[in-house]
């Protein structure tokens, strides 16, 4: 097993024999790969490539309340409470994209930004990478969500949002990770 600080090996024990686009739209490309598996057997692998970097914003006000947005998520056919999040296209910095998403979805602007971390959201089938921020020193404005977003906005105490990520009321991966990282950072103070 490679050491934690060793660079990854290209394709690791997998060998890609062919790659073709199975599906494509402005946001994702689905690749169909013919591969040789680690055990030497032939196989196939589907990979979802995301055009944009995902960003999420954990906005916390002076009363230690977290800003959540609620919306129906088409892929799950379920309603989801989550932090403001969205995609950052090439050419836009992650921080500028996070500022834009917070402003568009909620009308909120933040004076203070701290990067909380990065993660791969579903690395067995996707290359989607996410970056998340803590935003504070907030001022209110007017939201301008895009036509695909029918959003509700709610402020909840930080401790309640932490509980929601623990008991399954919040399942959005980016929200769970950002909230848990912020909670762990508070414990280590």
Protein language model features and the residues they cover:
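Unchanged
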Residues: 43-44, 51-56, 61, 87-174
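A glycine-rich, hydrophobic loop/mini-helix early in the fold
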Residues: 52-78, 82-85
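Generic C-terminal helix-cap and adjacent flexible tail
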Residues: 184-189
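Short glycine/serine/proline-enriched coil/turn segments at secondary-structure junctions
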Residues: 25, 75, 123-125
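Extreme N-terminal tail/first-helix region
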Residues: 1-24
